[in-house]
């Protein structure tokens, strides 16, 4: 099993897909990485040579912010917004959707399970 930036890549998947297991790397970025390193995107992870693996590792570490560093940066950005008290920070603090979604209905993922109100009955 190939290991890049602390992530075990699945052996049987194509490199284009396998690289997306790294936090911060999607399909587009994966294709950019493979083009820059000259590795065929249809190559399976198990077929990579040690030389190609080293080249991939060096490229990712030198040019991209991924995994722990990226997670820390995102958390720091959220913390900063909360501290300065901007609208997005307030939404984060209250656990509500940040990007303008409706909250009268839906938004259950952000708000958590429904809280029942005692004494409230259905109007006829």
Curated annotation (Swiss-Prot):
One GO CC term on file: cytosol
Pfam family, one: Ribosomal_S13
InterPro entries named in the record: Rbsml_uS13_C (IPR027437), Ribosomal_uS13 (IPR001892), Ribosomal_uS13-like_H2TH (IPR010979), Ribosomal_uS13_bac-type (IPR019980), Ribosomal_uS13_CS (IPR018269)
Phosphoprotein among keywords: no
Domain of life: Bacteria
Alphabetized GO MF terms: rRNA binding; structural constituent of ribosome; tRNA binding
Keywords: Ribonucleoprotein, Ribosomal protein, RNA-binding, rRNA-binding, tRNA-binding
Region described as Disordered: 95-124
GO biological process: translation
NCBIfam families documented for this protein: uS13_bact (TIGR03631)
Subunit structure: Part of the 30S ribosomal subunit. Forms a loose heterodimer with protein S19. Forms two bridges to the 50S subunit in the 70S ribosome.
Family listed: Belongs to the universal ribosomal protein uS13 family.
PANTHER family membership: 30S RIBOSOMAL PROTEIN S13/40S RIBOSOMAL PROTEIN S18, SMALL RIBOSOMAL SUBUNIT PROTEIN US13M
Functional summary from the UniProt entry: Located at the top of the head of the 30S subunit, it contacts several helices of the 16S rRNA. In the 70S ribosome it contacts the 23S rRNA (bridge B1a) and protein L5 of the 50S subunit (bridge B1b), connecting the 2 subunits; these bridges are implicated in subunit movement. Contacts the tRNAs in the A and P-sites.
Name of this protein: Small ribosomal subunit protein uS13
Natural source organism: Mycolicibacterium paratuberculosis (strain ATCC BAA-968 / K-10)
Gene (UniProt): rpsM
């Amino acid at each position: 099993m190939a290991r890049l930036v602390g992530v075990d890549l699945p052996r049987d998947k194509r490199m284009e897909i396998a690289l997306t297991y790294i936090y911060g790397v999607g399909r587009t970025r994966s294709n950019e990485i493979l083009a820059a390193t000259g590795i065929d995107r249809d190559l399976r992870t198990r077929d990579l040579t040690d030389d190609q693996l080293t080249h991939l590792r060096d490229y990712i570490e030198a040019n991209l912010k991924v995994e722990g560093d990226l997670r820390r940066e995102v958390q720091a950005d959220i913390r900063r917004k909360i501290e300065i008290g901007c609208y997005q920070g307030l939404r984060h603090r209250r656990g509500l959707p940040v990007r303008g979604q409706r909250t009268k209905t839906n938004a259950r993922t952000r708000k958590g399970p429904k809280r029942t109100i005692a004494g409230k009955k259905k109007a006829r």
